[in-house]
A protein has these predicted regions:
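Bacterial N-terminal signal peptides
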Residues: 8-19
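Positively charged n-region of N-terminal signal peptides that target proteins for export
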Residues: 1-5
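Short, small/polar residue-rich loop motifs at catalytic or cofactor-binding pockets
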Residues: 38-39, 82-83, 196-197, 220-222
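A short, Trp-centered hydrophobic/proline-enriched beta-strand micro-motif
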Residues: 35-45
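Boundary at the C-terminal end of the N-terminal hydrophobic targeting segment
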Residues: 23-28
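Short, exposed beta-strand-loop hairpins at the edges of beta-sheets
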Residues: 218, 224-241
Length: 248
């Protein structure tokens, strides 16, 4: 049954995510009965032993595609930050629209939409609306600052492309490396990243030892290691700089 469930999950990755979800604290909208929550929860962001931020997320899927929503909150003394994002994907896992909003410390927002061979980002600086074009296909993966759940979506794409079905679940060749084109709307920059399967590892999280699948994510801005559990959900990320992200 586990294999069947995983194959359904990865089929959703090809048809990936139509996620319709509501950020934490927002008024819940009426949902289409055919929509299904694929993943939901929260991540703690740690610098050393100190928790510095929390991301709350939902991934939902329906016949029209997927929606990934996320809310990021950070409070360090008087410095408070609050942002939210919404990523909508078509059934073929192509970008329909991406929006992020900052409520604190300043109010700003940006939207990315496809336009033929371009992706167009519209963003505000002060009261001025700006526009920037990127010569990128709609298959480009959004990897924005602060929203770690988007790395799970990228991981599912990797699983679909690099791994195959086995009796015990999915088989991923160790050392198999794939490249993906990405866009970071916060930085208004694009880059290629690579993911490589690092094998199975025993990792202790919240005092409990688990056997997890390790992957290495590399890009121009730095390297991350991340771990997926047996349900192929992101449970841990660690940056070279020492930042760690843990599922609550």
């Amino acid at each position: 049954m586990k294999t069947v469930r995983i194959l359904w999950l990865l089929a959703s990755v090809v048809c990936l995510l139509q996620i319709v979800s509501t950020p934490a604290g927002a008024k819940e909208k009426e949902k289409d009965p055919s929509e299904k929550t694929v993943d939901s929860g929260s991540f703690g962001v740690f610098s050393g032993e100190h928790r510095v931020a929390t991301e709350t997320f939902t991934i939902a899927q329906g016949p029209g595609g997927s929606v990934v929503t996320s809310e990021f909150k950070s409070a360090q003394g008087e410095q408070v930050a609050e942002q939210s994002s919404r990523l909508e994907l078509t059934p073929s896992v192509e970008l329909r629209v991406y929006t992020w909003k900052e409520a604190l410390p300043e109010k700003t927002q940006a939207t990315v939409t496809p336009n033929e061979t371009f992706l167009i980002e519209r963003f505000t600086v002060g009261d001025k609306l700006n526009e920037q074009n990127f010569l990128l296909p709609t298959s480009t993966t959004i990897l924005d600052d602060y929203f770690f759940i988007q790395r799970e979506v990228l991981a599912w794409k990797y699983l679909h492309m690099a791994c195959h079905d086995e009796k015990a679940g999915l088989g991923c060749p160790r050392g198999q490396k794939l490249q993906f084109g990405t866009l970071n709307p916060h930085q208004r920059s694009s880059m290629n990243v690579s993911i490589e399967f690092g094998g199975k590892e025993k990792v202790t999280i919240h005092g409990k030892e688990q056997e997890l699948s390790r992957f290495n994510l590399s890009g121009e801005t730095g390297d991350w290691a991340f771990w997926l559990d047996e349900q192929y959900k992101l449970v841990r990320m660690r940056a070279d700089a020492g930042v760690e992200v843990l599922r609550d």
